[in-house]
Amino acid sequence: SVGFKAGVKDYKLTYYTPEYETKDTDILAAFRVTPQPGVPPEEAGAAVAAESSTGTWTTVWTDGLTSLDRYKGRCYGIEPVPGEENQYIAYVAYPLDLFEEGSVTNMFTSIVGNVFGFKALRALRLEDLRIPTAYIKTFQGPPHGIQVERDKLNKYGRPLLGCTIKPKLGLSAKNYGRAVYECLRGGLDFTKDDENVNSQPFMRWRDRFLFCAEAIYKSQAETGEIKGHYLNATAGTCEEMMKRAIFARELGAPIVMHDYLTGGFTANTSLAHYCRDNGLLLHIHRAMHAVIDRQKNHGMHFRVLAKALRLSGGDHIHAGTVVGKLEGERDITLGFVDLLRDDFVEKDRSRGIYFTQDWVSLPGVLPVASGGIHVWHMPALTEIFGDDSVLQFGGGTLGHPWGNAPGAVANRVALEACVQARNEGRDLAREGNEIIREASKWSPELAAACEVWKAIKFEFEAVDTL
């Protein structure tokens, strides 16, 4: 028989290989697959492997011009999801040669590209990725990392405190700068541009940068502490984004900010490289993440977006609070917090970690807890996140009945009280409220904050459980 065998054949004949032994250089993926009725799970898993690597819907003549065995993705394992009908975890291994070095963009285009619209699947979710050390070494990663940031700021042994300036839209640059100054002067380490503050008619970016720089220098001089404001450099083009980052550096600002999902991984990686070369810290906001990660059976889990950010580069990233107004279950959140901070993370299915991940020498990222948190949450936050974190109170600072600076004082006093209590061996989980009450006796600012928020709770079940 001359030529090749044309026609359509089952994916599983080529792409389902349960006997395959994964290599150290493979990128491994765990997908939650919901096949259409009548599609066997092996075929669905193989289809995912094929469509996200070398396959197409029919045999093509040009397959003969390459070595499919060398380049194809392989579904090497399938397991049913306990408690779910017709859902499976499909494990897929991709040879490293399929991916461009140092490009999160290219990695995602393959692994979570067209395959998510594939008709034979009702739904598909990427739960986790194991990124091999060989691929990690092609990335710069975070511009500075946790230790370098602490050294730059000269702040040790406690979480850092931040505040998002509200109202998020509508303030003039001068009034915005004033709010920044008051918060920093009151005792916060950082203030933050809201993610949707870019350069709007009511406040152009250059004016905001100038007034915020003034606020930073004034509050530094008065407190003797190093201060920062996350200047949001996110823009409509990469060139404009870089222009803003360069201006921030010229002002001597310590940190800039980027919305990495709406801005895109290509822009983010460029900015991260600039930040390392020029000594700027990079704060990352995850606006749009819930569009991708909130549905349990379709999309991509945030732990994958977090890993991708560590590769692309950022020194801080928003990572949920466990206790505030935004989604995040405790064990799952702590799972990806470890993936952001630690050098080596063991597989632990109870926390949603499907693979052991070795980050080799990539710096760590500080998780940022932000969204609906206030002084009564401080003991829980200190206990859950530990020292290497940024705790951000927007309304929880600016909503103080006496104003912004007293709001900042209340948060700083609450934090210092929790850290001291923990260092003295007290149990923050059990004695948290008592610790805050004791501290409020000698801090009228904290007492006023405690009174305002004593009954506020955001209690809904988490949507994204294991």
From Swiss-Prot:
Post-translational modification as stated in the protein's UniProt record: The disulfide bond which can form in the large chain dimeric partners within the hexadecamer appears to be associated with oxidative stress and protein turnover.
Site (Transition state stabilizer): K325
Source superkingdom: Eukaryota
Cellular compartments annotated: Plastid, Chloroplast
Modified residue annotations for N6-carboxylysine: K192
Cited function: RuBisCO catalyzes two reactions: the carboxylation of D-ribulose 1,5-bisphosphate, the primary event in carbon dioxide fixation, as well as the oxidative fragmentation of the pentose substrate in the photorespiration process. Both reactions occur simultaneously and in competition at the same active site.
Other information: The basic functional RuBisCO is composed of a large chain homodimer in a 'head-to-tail' conformation. In form I RuBisCO this homodimer is arranged in a barrel-like tetramer with the small subunits forming a tetrameric 'cap' on each end of the 'barrel'.
Assembly and interaction partners: Heterohexadecamer of 8 large chains and 8 small chains; disulfide-linked. The disulfide link is formed within the large subunit homodimers.
Protein name as annotated: Ribulose bisphosphate carboxylase large chain
Natural source organism: Cucurbita pepo (Vegetable marrow)
Lineage: Eukaryota, Viridiplantae, Streptophyta, Embryophyta, Tracheophyta
Name of the gene: rbcL
